[in-house]
Amino acid sequence: QTSLPWPTLLTAFDQLDAMLNTMPMEVTFVDHEDINRYFNDGEKVFKRPTTAIGRDVFSCHPPKVEPIVRGIIDSFRKGDRDNVAVWLEKQGRPFYVNYMAVRDKNKKYLGTLELVQDMQFAKDHFARSK
C-alpha cells in the first residue's frame, strides 16, 4: 500500500480513491496535454467508458460540444479564466457542471477538473419548503 505524503494529506491510494468515489458527484481530471487522466466510479450523467482514460478529451465529446469544451480549456490554459459553471437539465433533472482550472503554486496550468452534480435534491428541498 503506497502512501501519499502531501503536506495536507497522509493517506493511501485506496483511501483517496474511496474518498473520491464517496463524493455525490462526478469527478473528472484532464491533464495539461488534454488527456483524460481520472474519473471516479459511479453512475454518470456523461457516460465515460474506461477506455477514455489516456485518450484526448476532445475525442470523447460529440462534435457540437467539442468547440465549447476546447474553448473552456483554452481559456484556462491562457489564464483568462479559472472557472466555468454551467446549469443544465437532462431527463428532467437539474445538473450543475463546474469546470475549474487546476494550477500549481506558481499558477502554472496543470489541467482541468470537471465536477458534475445532480441538483434534484436541492430542487426537491426548496419545493417542499414553499
What are the residue ranges of the model-derived segments?
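Sensory/regulatory domains in signal-transduction proteins
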Residues: 42-123
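PAS-family sensory domains
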Residues: 4-74, 128-130
